[in-house]
Amino acid sequence: MSAVLGYESAREAERVWVDGPGSHRVSCAYKEELLAALHDLKPRRGARLVLFGADVGELAEAERAALMRRMGFVPANGGLMSSLNAWENISLPLAYHAPEKLPAALREVRALLEELGGVGDELLGKLPEHMTLYERRLAAYIRALLEGPDLLVMESLAAGLGPTKRARAARFAEVYQARRPGGTFVHFDA
């Protein structure tokens, strides 16, 4: 049971198994079921979720919480708080979980914005309702990346984006791997 991410659906013989570090595109008939199980680390009755080699159903709550801290998740729509601008959405988790990283974070965020979006500082002041789909995903991706997860799951990497933005989004996996060489990047695009 060495899978970084594994899921067996209760409904059919649907199985998702990601065995090692690197970038993985996953196709899954029960994507929503799997994403829900990842979100709260509680697989549906009869299903099985494996993270970092551990069967989540057999873990105590404290052990599940420890696994959750090793994961980053980016919803298809970005999952940003509507009343916070991009910088506030990006920096809020750091303020709670790693306040010592905040002083250097703005420099790092600016470099990532330039590298991945070519958008510069103007994105940082935007509210989600004024962002494009790509900008929302970019902000959410950067937010997750700054926390340094061992497993980064993107619900959708390129769906709904035009060719230029799809090409930029395709670099998310490359940038993640450069920062977390032993980490695993998973997305669910077809």
Segments (PLM) and residue ranges:
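Glycine-rich P-loop/Walker A and Walker A-like loops and their local beta1-loop-alpha1 context
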Residues: V4-P43
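Catalytic "switch" loops of ABC-type ATPases
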Residues: L41, R70, V74-M81
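Conserved ABC transporter NBD signature motif
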Residues: R44-G57
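ABC ATPase NBD coupling module
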Residues: V56-G72
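Q-loop/switch helix immediately C-terminal to the Walker
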Residues: N77, S83-P99, A104, E108
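ABC ATPase C-loop
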Residues: A144-L145
